[in-house]
Amino acid sequence: MAHFNQNFINSIKQDLPSHLCMEDFISYSSKPLRPSIRVNTLKISSKNFIKLMTPKGWHFDPIPWCENGYWIKLDQEVQLGNTIEHLQGLFYIQEASSMLPPTALLSVEQHDAQQYVLDMASAPGSKTTQIAALMGNKGLLVANEYSASRVKVLHANIARMGVANCALTHFDARVFGEYMFEIFDSVLLDAPCSGEGTIRKDPDALKNWDNNDVKGIVDTQKALIDSAFQSLKAGGELVYSTCALSRQENQNVCDYLKQRYPDAVEFINLSSLFPGADKSCTEEGFLHVWPQIYDSEGFFVAKIKKVSSIERVLPEPKKQKNFPFEKASAKKIAEIVEYLKTSFGIVLPSENGIYVRDAEVWLFPEDFHKLIGKMRFQRIGMKLADVLKKGFKVKHEAVLALTSPNTIELTDDEAQVFLMGRDITLSEKVKPQGETIVSYAGVSLGVVKHLGNKLKNNLPRDLVKDKIARYEQS
């Protein structure tokens, strides 16, 4: 049962639109959320995913604002995070409302465009991986996370979902306006907030709500939206979102930006973003999603266009030195391209982004070179392979992100054995094939060494699971 702080109730009454009632808000906020997932179209189409999961007792109800998002019901209770399909990155467990900001950020017309996109507060990665899918793994996506512990989680999800066009940073996002002034075509600021809209997931979210705490959060939000706007190119678009419900964390923060840059800020009306969007649309054109409108978490989404350039206040910082990578030589590029093609049938999307560091070969997003020296990056693109005395050894994250036509397809039971870190015994002995990719549902799971009578497991130890969720046979 949700716990409502009376101070919060008194405050939120003032912000609740006149056509909505407090009783419905409390009623819906006390209900559990409908489980929802987003299909990862970097690996599988929604059509094929539904075809794969329907025989396993999944039922799908489309989420109107995300073309690959679904509310789901299962015939039997299964731990979704431990299913084969989740572990191999076919879907992301994501609350329906949180799929709104990326949808608002990148319209269908912008899908696959070669552009620079910034996600200022990325972890754990639901919106980042959704943006990457909307970009079709093209262009450059900079994903920033301030919390050191959450950067690791962010990278794990990016790797699992097969994201290849991403560069990770670890900064207080207030620095982007200074270090990346007018660089990005699109910016998402899913701002830290009081989390009022998450009460359906966390019944204690409002137990200790205090308006004095909110005032401090608002100051941070204003500084962040200012930084986001400075990092945006003229003509670029910014989406500001929170899972808060009050005007002071939402409309007022957007109004602050408009007052600060009156000639450069234009609010974009989102009333036609999806069928029914008008039900949550404010007079400014923002989406203020209350739990009772779509039976979801509470959320706020605003889209802002930068109609003209602004004056740079701080001088351009000095160029960062000691970039630890160097462009691969033509010889090294030819060798790694040949290795991947001959061994696995993998054809790289581009050879322009191949860099080396010590005995490592990396594939950077093709347009990343323009950002070298602007700031320090935690991780760029993906590691393709380690250089051995003779040849290379492919990395797991590369196998997950790059399509291979030459795989050994595993059964349900074999895929579970593989994800638990065990070797797979073959029914009959054949000629050893060496390094080979194994797949499930036509999507890569990882690398094995084919020894003729068994497949030796090469799954990274930190990805090995003690238990894989199983569906009981009906």
UniProtKB/Swiss-Prot annotation:
Q: Where is the active site?
A: 243 (nucleophile)
Q: Which gene encodes it?
A: rsmF
Principal subcellular localization: cytoplasm
Q: What class of enzyme is it?
A: transferase
Name used for this protein in its record = Ribosomal RNA small subunit methyltransferase F
List locations, semicolon-separated: Cytoplasm
Offer an example of a GO molecular function term for this protein.
RNA binding
User: Which GO cellular component terms, listed alphabetically, does the Swiss-Prot or TrEMBL entry include?
Assistant: cytoplasm
Which species? Shewanella piezotolerans (strain WP3 / JCM 13877)
Family membership noted in the UniProt record: Belongs to the class I-like SAM-binding methyltransferase superfamily. RsmB/NOP family.
Q: Which NCBIfam families match?
A: nop2p (TIGR00446), PRK11933.1 (NF008898)
Q: What is its EC number?
A: 2.1.1.178
Quote the Pfam families the UniProt record gives. Answer: Methyltr_RsmB-F, Methyltr_RsmF_N, Methyltranf_PUA, YebU_pre-PUA_dom
Q: Which UniProt keywords apply?
A: Cytoplasm, Methyltransferase, RNA-binding, rRNA processing, S-adenosyl-L-methionine, Transferase
